[in-house]
């Protein structure tokens, strides 16, 4: 490409942003515990086994615990280290609660339960070594996606039920099943975690009378203190199923007393658009009488699970945008990508075959939020800027850090050739896209063959480099040109990506719009994220309105993610504050220009 091309690249990110998890730790943002008297050591030593763990990056905090990535000094195996200061375990009931949590969790081993790998202590801390769940929890998924597609909900719920079946077989009642305690590994497998409220049933028919703490999805029999047992977990799964399909919890109000009143009265409604089979299962689980609810072992025999499609795997892209379920698995060309042609074993009502011509792309109409969350982002930025975060007597920016909000996708490289063709860019997963001057977009996935084409009206088509309509030949050639340029000039080419099962359902966010000013380039993705790359010092902001968070990459290429509401509370440095003020102006510009052409002319 000629000298007319302008290029940019993203700074060095952490080892793999967006791939961290905090099993067993409540959502960050719970009231922060008082700072421990002692510093957490850099190397944690288990005195019994002599194993040494090197403390890595911060993963999050909640309740009394802080969580870090830790790695075995010898094997290099990576875990999540839950670290609790003993200064916060002074009362007998606090120590007993921690002991009970460890005692129950260490007795469990199942594919859908967070792995427990040991615990030890020194004079100042208790250390718990847990399986690292790199894709966080269903809570972050819910914040980004709200209502899921029915096959996704089935996929997650099946695994939750399997994990809970195991707990109940082992006489354990979890008592706090909620989105934030359902963690996800790299393969998007569910892992049940946080056994802080769990209890063990000592004899058949035992009804537990007390419960320390407030579960999110609390069952009516717990509120009435009449005694409760395994049925409370089925109630919670009913609440989870409702939340996954509807996009909000069934009894949610702004006031806890009102919520509890609704639970006692069983006052909730299921929207009309929910599949009657799904609605029926929710109603069965959310019955006030615990004995009327299905048992955990009966759930998977329900029609919701037996008659609907359950994907074997889901792609990582599902964490931020819906998958391609408009291509029903059996409607694909049988010779095309085997995993999708195989429906669940024992499926009662397989979808009818709908053969298509080889070159006919699969089309999906996109239902996009009108302003793609820009109004929410503007409000969030207005709020944080109005608090004057850098004008504090004491700025505690590190307290606002929330790694759970790390973006799933961002632009890692870009190249401006809009005088002729458009803007080319690469996402952090090594996929490459072009927003052409005619307002169409084309994305090449990191497998080097799959393509996603988005027309001016937002209609999406899925095709491949090896099989596409002739009308797209020129655009595919240009896309390859952009890709080769970025590989050669901006960063060394990424390693070959091994396709994983589930990738055939992937849909990537695309570049919705962009513009340049004298100071920066502003990029707006279809998942709502806005990225601002500053030219002079190469600092960057990635704003996510759904997580209400900002990722700041400073001059040292340090990559940190903050919750905007916590920056209001704890303050931030002048450098970040000035960039947040600039971001507000740019988001305002995006909003006022959204009806204009995709290539906004900056003044």
UniProtKB/Swiss-Prot annotation:
Changing residue 67 to V: In analog-sensitive mutant; enlarged catalytic pocket to accommodate purine analogs. Changing residue 82 to M: Loss of kinase activity. No effect on S-phase progression. Changing residue 137 to D: Increases activity. Results in a block in G1/S. ATP binds at residues 59-67, 82, 131, 178-181, 194. Activated by phosphorylation of Thr-210 by AURKA; phosphorylation by AURKA is enhanced by BORA. Once activated, activity is stimulated by binding target proteins. Binding of target proteins has no effect on the non-activated kinase. Several inhibitors targeting PLKs are currently in development and are under investigation in a growing number of clinical trials, such as BI 2536, an ATP-competitive PLK1 inhibitor or BI 6727, a dihydropteridinone that specifically inhibits the catalytic activity of PLK1. A motif (D-box that targets the protein for proteasomal degradation in anaphase) lies at residues 337-340. It catalyses: L-seryl-[protein] + ATP = O-phospho-L-seryl-[protein] + ADP + H(+); L-threonyl-[protein] + ATP = O-phospho-L-threonyl-[protein] + ADP + H(+). Residues 351-364 have a biased composition (Basic and acidic residues). It is found in: Nucleus; Chromosome, Centromere, Kinetochore; Cytoplasm, Cytoskeleton, Microtubule organizing center, Centrosome; Cytoplasm, Cytoskeleton, Spindle. The modification Phosphothreonine is found at residues 6, 210, 214, 498. Induction: By growth-stimulating agents. Pfam families: Pkinase, POLO_box. Changing residue 340 to A: Interferes with ubiquitination and subsequent proteasomal degradation in anaphase. Interacts with CEP170. Interacts with EVI5. Interacts with FAM29A. Interacts with SLX4/BTBD12. Interacts with TTDN1. Interacts (via POLO-box domain) with the phosphorylated form of BUB1, CDC25C and CENPU. Interacts with KIF2A. Interacts with CYLD. Part of an astrin (SPAG5)-kinastrin (SKAP) complex containing KNSTRN, SPAG5, PLK1, DYNLL1 and SGO2. Interacts with BIRC6/bruce. Interacts with CDK1-phosphorylated FRY; this interaction occurs in mitotic cells, but not in interphase cells. FRY interaction facilitates AURKA-mediated PLK1 phosphorylation. This is Serine/threonine-protein kinase PLK1. It comes from Homo sapiens.
């Amino acid at each position: 490409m000629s000298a007319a091309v302008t290029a940019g690249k993203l700074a060095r990110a952490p080892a793999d942003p967006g791939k961290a998890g905090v099993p067993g730790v409540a959502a960050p943002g719970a009231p922060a515990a008082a700072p421990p008297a002692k510093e957490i050591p850099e190397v944690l030593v288990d005195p019994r086994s002599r194993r040494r763990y090197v403390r890595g990056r911060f993963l999050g905090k909640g309740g009394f615990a802080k969580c870090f990535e830790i790695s075995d000094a010898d094997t290099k195996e990576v875990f999540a280290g839950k670290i609790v200061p003993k200064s916060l375990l002074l009362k007998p009931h606090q120590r007993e609660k921690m002991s009970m949590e460890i005692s129950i969790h260490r007795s469990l081993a199942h594919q859908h339960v967070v792995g427990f790998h040991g615990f030890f202590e020194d004079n100042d801390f208790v250390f718990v070594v847990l399986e690292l769940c790199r894709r966080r929890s269903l809570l972050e998924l819910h914040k980004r996606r709200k209502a899921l597609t029915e096959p996704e909900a089935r996929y997650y719920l099946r695994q939750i039920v399997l994990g809970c079946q195991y707990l109940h077989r082992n006489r354990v009642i979890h008592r706090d099943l909620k989105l934030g305690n359902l963690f996800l590994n790299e393969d998007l497998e569910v892992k049940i975690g946080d056994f802080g409220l769990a209890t063990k049933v000592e004899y058949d028919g035992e009804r537990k009378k007390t419960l320390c703490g407030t579960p999110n999805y609390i069952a009516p029999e717990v509120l009435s203190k009449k005694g409760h047992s395994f049925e409370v977990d089925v109630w919670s799964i009913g609440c989870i199923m409702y939340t996954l399909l509807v996009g909000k919890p069934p009894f949610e109000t702004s006031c806890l007393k009102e919520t509890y009143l609704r639970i006692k009265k069983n006052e909730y409604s299921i929207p009309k658009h929910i599949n009657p089979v799904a609605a029926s299962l929710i109603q069965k689980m959310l019955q006030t009488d615990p004995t009327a609810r299905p048992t955990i072992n009966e759930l998977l025999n329900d029609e919701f699970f037996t008659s609907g499609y359950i994907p074997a795997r889901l792609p990582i892209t599902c964490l931020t945008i819906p998958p391609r379920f408009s291509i029903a698995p059996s409607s694909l060309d049988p010779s095309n990508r085997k995993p999708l042609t195989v429906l669940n074993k024992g499926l009662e009502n397989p979808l009818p075959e709908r053969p298509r011509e080889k070159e006919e792309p699969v089309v999906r109409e996109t239902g996009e939020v009108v302003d793609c969350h820009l109004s929410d982002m503007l409000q969030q930025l207005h709020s944080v800027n109005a608090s004057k975060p850098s004008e504090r007597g004491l700025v505690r920016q590190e307290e606002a850090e929330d790694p759970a909000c790390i973006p799933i996708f961002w632009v890692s490289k870009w190249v401006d050739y809009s005088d002729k063709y458009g803007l080319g860019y690469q996402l952090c997963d090594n996929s490459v896209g072009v927003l052409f001057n005619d307002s169409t977009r084309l994305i090449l996935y990191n497998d080097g063959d799959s393509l996603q084409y988005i027309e001016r009206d937002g209609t999406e088509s899925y095709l491949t480099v090896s099989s596409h309509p002739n009308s797209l030949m020129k655009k595919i050639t240009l896309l390859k040109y952009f890709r080769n340029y970025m590989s050669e000039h901006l960063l060394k080419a990424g390693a070959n990506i091994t396709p994983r099962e589930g990738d055939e359902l992937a849909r990537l966010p695309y570049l919705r719009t962009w513009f340049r000013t004298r100071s920066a380039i502003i990029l707006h993705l279809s998942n709502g994220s806005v990225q601002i790359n500053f030219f002079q010092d190469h600092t960057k902001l990635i704003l996510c309105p759904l997580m209400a968070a900002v990722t700041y990459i400073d001059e040292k290429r340090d990559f940190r993610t903050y919750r905007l509401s916590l920056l209001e509370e704890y303050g931030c440095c002048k450098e970040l504050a000035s960039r947040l003020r600039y971001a507000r102006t740019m988001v305002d510009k995006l909003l006022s220009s959204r009806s204009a052409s995709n290539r906004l002319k900056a003044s």
